């Protein structure tokens, strides 16, 4: 795991538990030597079953809390919302687990 993510692992775990996250993965530049102070962080999340209002609240609160922790833009994709099979295959081939419940 990237040291930038690992350094904040306890905070990430707490956020994921509080926002009913089933799994959270990183992908993209955060996992490569290209990651720098200007890079955003690409994450893909799968939430536990919940009603739509609770889901929306958990999604946005998680995204904003992660942005506050990392002090940078977070590109948070919802796993079920990725419809492009090629893009999903690319993500799945590169992603790294950050949290699982």
Ranges and model annotations:
Residues 1-25, 31-37, 50-101:
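Catalytic core of pol beta-like nucleotidyltransferases
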Residues 44-46:
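Short hydrophobic/aromatic beta-strand micro-patches
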């Amino acid at each position: 795991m990237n040291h930038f993510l690992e350094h904040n692992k306890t905070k990430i775990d707490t956020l994921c538990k509080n926002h009913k996250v089933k799994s959270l993965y990183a992908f993209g530049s955060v996992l490569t030597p290209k990651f720098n102070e200007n890079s955003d962080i690409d994450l893909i999340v799968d939430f536990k079953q919940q009603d739509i209002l609770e889901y929306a609240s958990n999604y946005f609160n998680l995204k904003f809390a992660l942005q506050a922790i990392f002090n940078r833009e977070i590109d948070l994709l919802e796993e079920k919302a990725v419809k492009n099979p090629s893009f999903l295959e690319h993500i799945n081939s590169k992603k790294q687990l950050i949290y699982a419940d």
